[in-house]
Every structure is written in C-alpha cells, then in structure tokens.
C-alpha cells in the first residue's frame, strides 16, 4: 500500500532538486521558444492523477480491457470539446504527440512510396512534412515547396509542383512561418490534382480556436495539431476531420492499433481541461494579445535594423535572420541564455550555416503572454535582445539585462499565490 504522504521530495531528493531547479528556471527566465507555453494547474493536476494507472486500449465503448467506464466518460468529454472548439465532426484525442498524429494520418491515407508535397524544413516547414531525416521523407516520395524572395509561400509554385508531381497528399503547415496560410487556395490546388489536403495547425491551434487565425477544418480532409504550444494544454496530439465515415475509420485504425497501443488517459483528461479552457471568452483575449505581442516585438527588431523573415508576423512567431550581422544562431542563443532569455536557434532561408549552427533565431510570444506581458513589456524585451545582439561578448550588457529580466519576471510570475 502506498502512503499519500510519500512525496518526491521525501523519496528522491536528487530528482526533486532538479525538478525544483526547473520550476525556478521557468519563473526566473523569459520564455520565447514559439512551441512552448505554461499549462494551468488544472492541466497539471489531471496529468498527475490516478488516471495514469489505467490501461484502455480501444475507443470509448469499444475497449479491450474492463474497468473503462470512467475513462470512457473522460475521453468522450475530450472528444466532444475538441469537436466543439474547432467545428469538427470527428476528433481523435489519443495521439501521444503531434508527430505521432501526423504519422497516423500518413498511415491511414497513403501507401509507402506515395508522393507528398509539403513545406521545406529549410523554409519553415516541419520534420514530419517530408524532411529527409524523418520517416515522412523516408517512407514517402517527398516533394518540397518553399517561400519566395519576400518570405511568402509562392502558391503558383505550389500549384506548379502539384501538377508536375501529382502528389497523393498536399501538406499545409509550418514550424517557422509567420504569415497566414491560404487554406482555400491549398484546397483548390489539391482538388485540381486529386490529392488529399492535410493541414498541420500545431503552431496556431490556439489562435484558430479563438478565431484570430483562419480555421482549416472546413477546407482540409484531415487536420492535426499538438495540444500544447498556443493551445496551452498538455504535450500531446489531436486529429480532426469533417464527416467522412471512410476517412474516420481509417484514422481510428491508424492510431490504434496501427501506430499506438494504450492511450494515455491522464493526458487525455488534461486535454479535456485545456479544451474547456479554450472555450472560455478570456481565451480569445489571450490569443489576441499573443499576436499583438509578436507584432510589437517584430517591429522593434525591424526598427533596429534586423531582418525579420517575411517582413513581420501575422501570428504568434517570427524568424530573425542574422546573416547580415554575420552572427550565428547558436552563439546568439547562448548569449541570450546567459541573460535568462530562452530562444531557439533556427535556420533561415538561404542560410549559409548548418542546422546545428544556423544564422537565425525563432521567437514566439505564447509563454510571455501567459505570464502577463503586453506590448510595452514586449517592446522593452525586444530592445534588450537587440542590445545583446549588438555585441555577444559584452558581459556587462548581458549582466544588466539579466537583472532586468529577473525583475520583470518577479513582477509577472507564471504561477501566482
């Protein structure tokens, strides 16, 4: 029998110390990684619940194990809320991650060797959209589209490639593209060549849920997303679709038993919590502020003479090219880290450096907006970053910025009393 008093602090001091250090880092550092956010205590409560003990292979009402009557209720809540949130007819809440959701879509609708047309990783796409190092690039014939000289997707080029290569599936989505995707145009191109349209909205799902970014569900054959990032839930995946019995059956089978065994019901419960949070009016206000903050930061970089890819942002993220400054993303990332500002190095279009070094940085505002930053704080923050980028070896500037960061983080904590 377990004692409820047996906490990690009492049982495993080494592990607890590292966990406490990470919690302190999250409070004292400014988080600007576009794919990161802070979940609510309710989301974390669900993830740490007794649901982690329950195995539940199958789907609600069709399980292979007994004792699933309550996890059936929980999973159905998550399904119903996801469908309501995104206006979908179908939702599968079982994928453990966004990449696994994407793999399940490919497994459901493609055969090995089929051609897919997705956005190049070097131009802002994702590994799972056909990158050569990913299974999506190894199992399928991946053709890539990119952005033009102005940093925008060239839809005429997408159409030309689609007509030339006749893909079985067109993938629309990104990990580092700051503009609005034209879902009607993607749909028209897919229809022209008889392809499935698959949209990966992992980065903008929260914006979509709040109505501040176009919803791809009415246009796509299938949509996937993560449940963290802008959606501000647990780390996990989600598949959505319009009513289509054949596709729904294929998707369910591709998730279980095709690519996963038992679902993580404690994470599914946390997804249900985050979907409920996203259905509240204040969530729209939050997402509107996320975009305002990203625009404010990008504007400062442009004013200070830096190159923002695509010339600005219409969502929660943007890419900063440091090619003109001859600064590597790796070195810039490290210098900002010493100032308690967390970013990620990122390749930029026509990057002369390797993906392990890069010539760019990716910024995102979901996390800082969660902790209460508005345009004024974001403009000030962007100015501090510019000061550091002006001389990565000026430790006096880095030290001064670090003290400012600690002060503003203390003023705007992630988790209040």
Curated annotation (Swiss-Prot):
Family from the record: Belongs to the SHMT family.
Described purpose of this protein according to its UniProt entry: Catalyzes the reversible interconversion of serine and glycine with tetrahydrofolate (THF) serving as the one-carbon carrier. This reaction serves as the major source of one-carbon groups required for the biosynthesis of purines, thymidylate, methionine, and other important biomolecules. Also exhibits THF-independent aldolase activity toward beta-hydroxyamino acids, producing glycine and aldehydes, via a retro-aldol mechanism.
Gene3D superfamilies attached to this UniProt entry: Aspartate Aminotransferase, domain 1 (3.90.1150.10), Type I PLP-dependent aspartate aminotransferase-like (Major domain) (3.40.640.10)
Pathway participation: One-carbon metabolism; tetrahydrofolate interconversion; Amino-acid biosynthesis; glycine biosynthesis; glycine from L-serine: step 1/1
PANTHER family: SERINE HYDROXYMETHYLTRANSFERASE
Alphabetic keyword roster: Amino-acid biosynthesis, Cytoplasm, One-carbon metabolism, Pyridoxal phosphate, Transferase
Main localisation: cytoplasm
GO biological process, one term: tetrahydrofolate interconversion
Site (Plays an important role in substrate specificity): 228
Any one Gene Ontology cellular component term annotated for this protein: cytosol
GO molecular function ontology, one term from the record: glycine hydroxymethyltransferase activity
Coiled coil regions, renumbered to chain: none
Protein name from the UniProt record: Serine hydroxymethyltransferase 1
Keyword Hydrolase: no
UniProt-listed Enzyme Commission number(s): 2.1.2.1
UniProt-listed PROSITE patterns: SHMT
Organismal lineage: Bacteria, Pseudomonadati, Pseudomonadota, Gammaproteobacteria, Pseudomonadales
4Fe-4S among keywords: no
N6-(pyridoxal phosphate)lysine sites (modified residues): 229
Pfam family of the protein (one): SHMT
Residue sites binding (6S)-5,6,7,8-tetrahydrofolate per the record: 121, 125-127, 354-356
Catalytic activity: (6R)-5,10-methylene-5,6,7,8-tetrahydrofolate + glycine + H2O = (6S)-5,6,7,8-tetrahydrofolate + L-serine
Enzyme category, top tier: transferase
Disulfide bonds: none
UniProt cofactor(s): pyridoxal 5'-phosphate
Subcellular location: Cytoplasm
Description of how the protein assembles with itself and partners: Homodimer.
């Amino acid at each position: 029998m377990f004692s409820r008093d047996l906490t990690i602090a009492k049982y495993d001091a080494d592990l607890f110390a590292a966990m406490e250090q990470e919690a302190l880092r999250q409070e004292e550092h400014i988080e600007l990684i576009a794919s990161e956010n802070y979940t609510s205590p309710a989301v974390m409560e669900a993830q740490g619940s007794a649901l982690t003990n329950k195995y539940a292979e199958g789907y609600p009402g069709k399980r292979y194990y007994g004792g699933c009557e309550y996890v059936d209720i929980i999973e159905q809540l998550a399904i119903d809320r996801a469908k309501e949130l995104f206006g979908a007819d179908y939702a599968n809440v079982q994928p453990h991650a966004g990449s696994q959701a994407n793999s399940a879509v490919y497994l459901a609708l493609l055969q090995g060797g089929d051609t897919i047309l997705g956005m190049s990783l070097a131009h802002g796409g994702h590994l799972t959209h056909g990158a050569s190092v990913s299974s999506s690039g190894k199992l399928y014939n991946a053709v890539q589209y990119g952005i033009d000289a102005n940093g925008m997707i060239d839809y005429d080029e997408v159409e030309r490639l689609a007509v030339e290569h006749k893909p079985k599936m067109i993938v629309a989505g990104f990990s580092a593209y700051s503009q609005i995707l034209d879902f009607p145009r993607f749909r028209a191109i897919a229809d022209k060549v008889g392809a499935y349209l698959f949209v990966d909205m992992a980065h903008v799902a929260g914006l979509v849920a709040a109505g501040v970014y176009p919803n791809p569900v009415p246009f796509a054959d299938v949509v996937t997303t993560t449940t963290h990032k802008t959606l501000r839930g647990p780390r996990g995946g989600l598949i959505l679709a319009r009513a289509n019995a054949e596709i729904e059956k294929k998707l369910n089978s591709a998730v279980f038993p095709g690519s996963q065994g038992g679902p993580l019901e404690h994470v599914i419960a946390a997804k249900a919590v985050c979907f409920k949070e996203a259905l509240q009016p204040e969530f729209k206000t939050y997402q509107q502020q996320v975009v305002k903050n990203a625009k404010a930061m990008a504007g400062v970089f442009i004013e200070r003479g830096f190159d923002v890819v695509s010339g600005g942002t219409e969502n929660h993220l943007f890419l900063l090219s440091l090619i003109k400054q001859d600064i590597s993303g790796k070195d810039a990332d490290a210098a900002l880290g010493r100032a308690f500002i967390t970013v990620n190095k990122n390749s930029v279009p026509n990057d002369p450096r390797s993906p392990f070094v890069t010539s760019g940085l990716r910024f995102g505002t979901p996390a800082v907006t969660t902790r209460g930053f508005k345009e004024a704080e974001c403009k000030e923050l962007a100015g501090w970053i510019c000061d550091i980028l002006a001389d990565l070896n000026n430790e006096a500037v880095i030290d001064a910025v670090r003290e400012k960061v600690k002060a503003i983080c203390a003023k705007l904590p992630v988790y209040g009393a």
